[in-house]
Amino acid sequence: MCVTYHNGTGYCKCPEGFLGEYCQHRDPCEKNRCQNGGTCVAQAMLGKATCRCASGFTGEDCQYSTSHPCFVSRPCLNGGTCHMLSRDTYECTCQVGFTGKECQWTDACLSHPCANGSTCTTVANQFSCKCLTGFTGQKCETDVNECDIPGHCQHGGTCLNLPGSYQCQCLQGFTGQYCDSLYVPCAPSPCVNGGTCRQTGDFTFECNCLPETVRRGTELWERDREVWNGKEHDEN
């Protein structure tokens, strides 16, 4: 509503819930969010508000008591920042180089002592490494030689130790991760690009290839049907 003075000037008298020279802002204090007796102070030009807290309270909405541990005991050590989660609980954000619930420990993992993809955790200023399968040692620096334990490779296969793992080299006629399967040349087919596999012996095969157009440089040429003589191969 516009109110006019005798001299011709006037102002806008805003209805409840609106503020500003032209009542263009909603009153941010309409729903008073300030707790514990706090007073809402509107910033009309910005449509925002702040809480002026009663004695003994703090926080954006005056929701925390100044007797909160973050204020009284200051539990976060070594420059850590205390975050109030509720009236009496908190969480510390630690400075780089420190860890622990209250940032009380030096972060022993900062130097990345754990090797080979292992996980580092700090406990009481010391690090502990959780190793991936295939590695051992305080820092997971030692490769486990799986081939020291017999029986990994079946049917006379030879065990080859690899970093963090091992591989079985199979005798003729066997295949699979543990040399536990009979080798059938065309099952599954090794031929690619639509080629057809034909078994030519106990351990040999050939691929009958489809006619294929191949680009070499700027020229196109047609490759006729050809036969590739395959030999036994190790799938591993």
Curated annotation (Swiss-Prot):
* Entry's Gene Ontology BP terms: cell differentiation; cerebral cortex development; Notch signaling pathway; positive regulation of Notch signaling pathway
Where is this chain primarily localised? Answer: secreted
GO CC annotations?
cytoplasm; extracellular region
What is the originating organism of this protein? Homo sapiens
Please report the stretch or stretches of sequence annotated as the EGF-like domain. 1-24, 25-63, 66-104, 105-141, 143-180, 182-219
**What does the protein in this record do?**
Human-specific protein that promotes neural progenitor proliferation and evolutionary expansion of the brain neocortex by regulating the Notch signaling pathway. Able to promote neural progenitor self-renewal, possibly by down-regulating neuronal differentiation genes, thereby delaying the differentiation of neuronal progenitors and leading to an overall final increase in neuronal production. Acts by enhancing the Notch signaling pathway via two different mechanisms that probably work in parallel to reach the same effect.
Which UniProt keyword terms apply here? Calcium, Cytoplasm, Developmental protein, Differentiation, Disulfide bond, EGF-like domain, Glycoprotein, Notch signaling pathway, Repeat, Secreted
Expressed, tissue-wise, as follows: Widely expressed with higher levels in leukocytes and lymph nodes. Expressed in radial glia neural stem cells during cortical development.
What PANTHER family does this protein's entry cite?
A: NOTCH LIGAND FAMILY MEMBER
Q: Name one Pfam family in it.
A: EGF_CA
Post-translation: what modifications?
Answer: Cleaved by ELANE.
Task: Enumerate the glycosylated residues.
Answer: 7
Q: Does the keyword Nucleotide-binding apply?
A: no
Summarize subunit and interaction data from the UniProt record for this chain.
Interacts with ELANE. Interacts with NOTCH2. Interacts with DLL1; the interaction is direct.
Annotated coiled-coil segments of the chain: none
Q: Which compartment or compartments is the protein found in? A: Secreted; Cytoplasm
Could you say which residues form the signal peptide?
none
Write down what this protein is called: Notch homolog 2 N-terminal-like protein A
Disulfide feature: 14-23, 29-40, 34-51, 53-62, 70-82, 76-92, 94-103, 109-120, 114-129, 131-140, 147-159, 153-168, 170-179, 186-197, 191-207
Linked pathology is: Defects in NOTCH2NLA may be a cause of chromosome 1q21.1 deletion/duplication syndrome. Deletions of NOTCH2NL (NOTCH2NLA, NOTCH2NLB and/or NOTCH2NLC) are present in patients affected by microcephaly, whereas macrocephaly is observed in patients with NOTCH2NL duplications.
What family is reported? Belongs to the NOTCH family.
Tell me a Gene Ontology molecular-function term this record carries.
Notch binding
